[in-house]
Amino acid sequence: MAALLGRDLLSLADISSTELQELLQLATQLKSQQLKLQCNKVLGLLFSKASTRTRVSFTVAMYQLGGQVIDLNPNVTQVSRGEPLQDTARVLDRYLDILAIRTFAQQDLETFAHYAKIPVINALTDAEHPCQVLADLLTIQESFNTLAGLTLTYVGDGNNMANSLMLGCALVGMNVRIATPDGYEPDSQIVEQARAIANNKTEVLLTHDPELAAKGSTVLYTDVWASMGQETEADNRMPIFQPYQISEQLLSLAAPEAIVLHCLPAHRGEEITEAVIEGSQSRVWEQAENRLHAQKALLASILGAE
């Protein structure tokens, strides 16, 4: 996929609808082993936040492509002692072929990408989580054999997942509804970006009513109510977010064929009930597996694997 060769992925707004559709097609081909690609490259993982799925899926994807992975824990690099990001970036780009960064501030990611000559991938920031949404869209496509015209409802905190889901859904022609408590809405600039991409052809709706949002939806999606770095707010958030739990009652308002997604880790009994996450409409485990296939497609595209 030559269009993404050598490019960064800092946000889903960085790619076109066509490029996103081609990535999903490549992920499907790689997953089914219709296509096997190889690249003799080195991926660096610079993660300031805890990670299970992102770390393991990127590592396995790179190994399966024939490449190598170096885990650059900031605590054992000079970053932890205050080395400027621009200095670290200009050193690492002389050793590595590509870098995936998981950090708090989107601005830090953008600084790294500005100074590094190698491609940089957003492996999660407080603002966006584009790689997760690649896997989400792949899972939805597998479930319905299409994306255009479907409706995804996200309930909970207007966090990085809500931001990236708005962009991803707009790019593939899906309607997206975001239901949050008052004061916990997604980033207003990203809302406007998503609406510009949708161009009045699909819906980008913000509401405080989870039942209204869920009604007739084909996908219900949630995430933790307190993200990494917000642990001290968890107890205060609990009563505020309780009406936004994906329960059997909320799921009953969705379309009969609706599926349920969660980016994990899940706090069962909080944002999602045990019955729903373990129920027949849950696609959470397929979604987690698809992190591997979606990110393998992304790496192969950026690195020009053949």
UniProtKB/Swiss-Prot annotation:
The name this protein goes by in its record: Ornithine carbamoyltransferase
Query: What is known about what this protein does?
Result: Reversibly catalyzes the transfer of the carbamoyl group from carbamoyl phosphate (CP) to the N(epsilon) atom of ornithine (ORN) to produce L-citrulline.
GO CC list? cytoplasm
Principal location listed in the UniProt entry: cytoplasm
Keyword Cytoplasm recorded: yes
Which reaction is recorded as catalysed by this protein? carbamoyl phosphate + L-ornithine = L-citrulline + phosphate + H(+)
Q: Where does carbamoyl phosphate bind?
A: S51, T52, R53, T54, Q78, R102, H129, P130, C131, Q132, C263, L264, R291
Which source organism does the UniProt entry give? Nostoc punctiforme (strain ATCC 29133 / PCC 73102)
Q: Give the Enzyme Commission number.
A: 2.1.3.3
